[in-house]
Curated annotation (Swiss-Prot):
Function: 5'->3' double-stranded DNA exonuclease which may also possess a cryptic 3'->5' double-stranded DNA exonuclease activity. Functions in DNA mismatch repair (MMR) to excise mismatch-containing DNA tracts directed by strand breaks located either 5' or 3' to the mismatch. Also exhibits endonuclease activity against 5'-overhanging flap structures similar to those generated by displacement synthesis when DNA polymerase encounters the 5'-end of a downstream Okazaki fragment.
Residues that, per the record, bind Mg(2+) 1: 30, 78, 150, 152
Domain of life, source organism: Eukaryota
Keyword set, alphabetical order: DNA damage, DNA excision, DNA repair, DNA-binding, Endonuclease, Excision nuclease, Exonuclease, Hydrolase, Magnesium, Metal-binding, Nuclease, Nucleus
Stretch list, region Disordered: 394-416, 453-474, 519-572, 590-685, 723-743, 773-835, 894-955
Subcellular localization(s) per the UniProt record: Nucleus
Classification via InterPro entries: 5-3_exonuclease_C_sf (IPR036279), EXO1_H3TH (IPR037315), HhH2 (IPR008918), PIN-like_dom_sf (IPR029060), PIN-like_EXO1 (IPR044752), TPR_rpt (IPR019734), XPG-I_dom (IPR006086), XPG/Rad2 (IPR006084)
Main subcellular location of this protein, as a coarse class: nucleus
Cofactor note text: Binds 2 magnesium ions per subunit. They probably participate in the reaction catalyzed by the enzyme. May bind an additional third magnesium ion after substrate binding.
Co-factor requirement: Mg(2+)
Protein name: Exonuclease 1
GO BP of this protein: DNA double-strand break processing; DNA repair; double-strand break repair via homologous recombination; regulation of protein localization to chromatin
Amino acid sequence: MGISGLLPALSPVTKAIHVKDYANKRVAIDGYSWLHKGAYSCSQEIVLGIPTRNYINYFISRIKMLISYKVIPVVIFDGGPLPNKKLKEQERLRHREEYKNKAKAYLLEGNKSQANICFQKAVDITPRMAFLLIKELRALKVEYLVAPYEADAQLTYLSITGQVDAIITEDSDLVAFGATHIIFKMDKYGYAQEIKTEDLGSCKKDGYDFIDFNQTMLRQMCILSGCDYLPSLSGMGLKTSFKLLKQHRDIEKVFKYLKREKSNFSQEYEQQFYKADFTFKHQRVFDPVSRILTTLLPLPTIIDSRFLNDNNNNTNDGDSNGDGSSGGSGSGGGFLDFIGPVIDDEIAEKIALGIIDPETHEQFDKTQPYPKNTFTPQPKKLLSPISFNTKEFKNQTNNNNNNNNNIKSNNGTNNKNGMILNEGKLVQKGRNLNDQFTFASNKITQYMTTTTTTTTTTTTTKNNNNNQKQQPMIEDDTGYDFQIDSFEIDDCLNDDDDDESIILSNNLNNQENVLESDCEFDDDDDQRGIDVDDSEKKDSFVLDSDYEDEKEEEEVKSSTFNSSSSISSGNSSKIKKTLVSSKFFVSSESSVLESDDDDGGDDDDDSFNHNQNFSSSGNNIQPNSNIFHNGELSSYGYQKNQKNFKNVNSNSSSNSSNSSNSSSGNSNSGNRIFNSGNSSNKNNTNGGIVKSTLLSSNDRVSLNFFDQFQFDGKKKQSILVSQSRKSFSSPTLSNNEDYDSSFVSSTIPSSIGDDYDQMNSCSNNNNFNYNNSSNFNNNNINNSNNNRNSGFSGFLKRKSSSQTAAPTTPTTPTTPKTSSSSSSTLTNSTITTEHSSYILKKPKYQATSNSPISTLDSSQNYNDQSFISKKAHSFSSLDSDLIFKEDDVDNLIFNNNNNNNNNNNNNNNNNNNNNNNNNNNNNNNNNNNNNNNNNNNNNNNNNDNNNKITTPSNKSFNSIVLTTTSATTSITQQDNEIYTTPKKKLPSTPISSSSNDIISKYFSSPSKVGPKSEGAPPTPVNLEGMSLRSVLSLRYQQTMASSPTK
């Protein structure tokens, strides 16, 4: 009973409900489906003719359950046999007889279990059984109707005319008929499953996709797969019929295909198919409002001769009203008998009231008075034809009620308002997201045509401000639709509520996690003033390496930037994938290049939104008053104050840097050099957006995101920001406001990745330069431009060999060589090589301010190149050595405004082992800015030394503290020379442990490097009082020294 496999195919649009959702609503019930269920418990009695009331009790219990939830039940019973279903009924009758005989045989053998199964299959619900139930319903004053023929068509008619709000059944044929709301599998507690026909367009599962289907295609698919009116062809199931209709979109084309491919396809099958389709649309039903016999959908005025009997070709007999109703004429004369013989309206009404047998037309009980009314008519919904636009597949409703007379048959042309079965020519059309399937409950005449109403699913698109053209949509191999836009905003965007906030919001199509910000953009491009460059759209692309698998929810990683003149954005929507989109924003004066890499909604603290730290005024971005956090100056505010402490040689070095970089950074090479200090760089006069094309690995400068790369030998372009930039970064790059974000996060080992959650990405300082004015007397050390392998790439190359190499000869400025950690010294020069930084993807967990991020185990090894986590890298498929080798060789930038100052050791570092405030045996050595006073207080009981470093600023903030657990090396400074002295093991408990010994491999040798100053012993510096950035800075300058002193 029903369409095999249809309900599982529609499971994506099946909703679990409870009948209380239909409280105070009218719900029709397929009476025979509940009678069959009730008969299972007493199948033996029913088959053998033993009187029983079990099936009635079952039915009444369900009715009372609905009433208890204030649902108004309307029971519909089957009527007489339908001629078009004659073969099916004969087959069922034969099967029931077979199972009846089997059940009796099992019963004689004593096999009651098998006998009970056979009895259940042999049960036949008769009109007499229905009449016994009707009498109970009358007593309960429950509404009911008996259909003239099939209850399915009667239920559908009540649904589409607004007499009931939903249908409870177990027969999937209701979907093919076109009922609007169908409830399946209801249990005795009222829980059930609901399918709405209007939702079928979004059904997509296991090869089924009904997005561009209509009601006609759905009905014909069900008929091809096999239904009660027509068996299917051999090998023709639901999925095969779906594919044929999906491909050809017209039943005539399907038949032409079947004639070529199927040997068992015949002309007789084709004719029976059209009869079945006609029966689904025009089966005879009873109208409870007008109390006449009518058809489910109005009959066409001209009927195809194939539907008429040879004995009678009168096309208007029995249809005097022109709407399918009989008009009281009982002479059917064989006219369309397969949809149900025409009967008098008086007989049809008696059948509907349950007075006479629908098969024999005999009265059930002559002693019973006639019921006056068993159904409460409801206002009919207006009937209006629906035409189908083959180009757009959109809703088009025609309110003209007289269009029924304009429907043509299949003998000629199509009517402009609709097309009937054999003349419906659907235009071949590809998938369109706007083509959604729906069915309006008040539009019943859609069954006359091959059309249906459709809802529209709109996708977020960007319109060109000039011609309002929709931007191109590209679909990748994973099936996700992306809209690749490249915008240039001519006008500065201001928010009405917060003029100090500018943020880019990623709009998702259907989605769950949207990055919340203080300032949101309106989707109207006219107000945003967005102009799209077609040349930029062609070169827009998304990296495969920018995707990261997510298990539970879809997220969006986005990089948001402050801007007052130019903004670039990109939107994406995907499932169980995370797209990292990195764009660059620039203000013409501030020149801060920033990038945040968020993990998709797991950061809710205020430090994440960097907008709060800026105030926008014209083209200037200035720090806001709320840059102070927890009583201390944030990293951004602190470093902004450092511009008052610029080195004396800053301007001269900056000029030399600009001149050297301007010659090498021409517009055709693809390089965009970022200098600080002056803005005299030729490529950086406007601070605007320029386009850069990758030519080779030696001709590019990589930013925080690798903006230039090649795919399949093709050039790709991206937007780079040419600007003068200062060496401070926004505090939003770290969730810890006290952390000095000028530290390059790419140097964090993967072994301490668990403690590295609060750093969203690298600090965006492309300079691996630690010019500390406080520790080294503000001496800017200059190195020649020939030091090609200095910088982070050379640092990586040298550190790998420093683990095992013995002390070697001093390095030269032009070709640095690998040397051990004990043989390198600092000369009076500073290496200012700028390196390409890269994006570290934040771990999937959230650290707190008390987490081990504030401490670092000295057992970790900085010399191990494995700390560059391939998973953390945004280009996970590339090797880390290759990345830095290609990026760092030719990109040397002299940056003289690096305010990477070592900060005061704060008392808030509670995890500091050996708290020196409570240990009077420790020797405290304070180095001021001039490094002239070195106070050494040696204690015989303890050799531990604590070095506190003061910066030029009186402001202090938290820095990362190193907690050593092994024999630690102290660093002292005397006349700008570094010495290393052995230390005893500190009695401290490590916060974190790792197999890599970081400090011991950098400062593993107890030997001193360089001569002592005259008249003063070396002053040891304890690593315990230094930040991680300071330690790495010292070690970096050691390894980069051109000539060690022994």
